[in-house]
């Protein structure tokens, strides 16, 4: 997808540890056009304005051990101001590292000024 669009992020496996502590949320984002990640389970979906569903997040349990979480979301930095987005990312990191994700999701409290870009990077 080229350019920012308003989308609703929907968990396809709501009880997966990466999805703990958040429900559907809306953001403006730019994501890759429907890539296929072989053998991974689709985890996150967005619906385009025309009604087409696009998978934007996956999880993968490796046969020999290890885990992966991938998402095509997160293009604009401003999305890190969204608590649900931050929680999804941190939950994904914890789960991939084999660390138990709390039932309420990871703590992602951040002071607002810590999320501001320096003026020269805006």
Language-model features, listed with the residues they occupy:
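An acidic, glycine-rich "communication" segment
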Residues: 1-51, 63, 105-122
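Extracellular ligand-binding/catalytic regions of CAZymes and related secreted enzymes
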Residues: 49-54, 62-122
């Amino acid at each position: 997808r080229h350019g920012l669009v308003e989308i609703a992020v929907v968990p396809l496996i709501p009880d997966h540890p990466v999805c703990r502590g958040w429900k559907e949320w809306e953001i403006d984002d730019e994501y890759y056009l429907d890539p296929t990640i072989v053998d991974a389970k689709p985890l996150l979906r967005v619906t385009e304005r025309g009604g087409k569903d696009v998978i934007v997040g996956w999880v993968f349990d490796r046969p020999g051990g290890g885990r992966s979480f991938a998402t095509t979301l997160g293009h604009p930095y401003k999305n890190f101001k969204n608590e649900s987005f931050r929680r999804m990312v941190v939950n994904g990191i914890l789960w991939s590292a084999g660390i138990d994700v709390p039932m309420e999701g990871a703590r992602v409290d951040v002071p607002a000024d810590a999320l501001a870009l320096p003026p020269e990077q805006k």
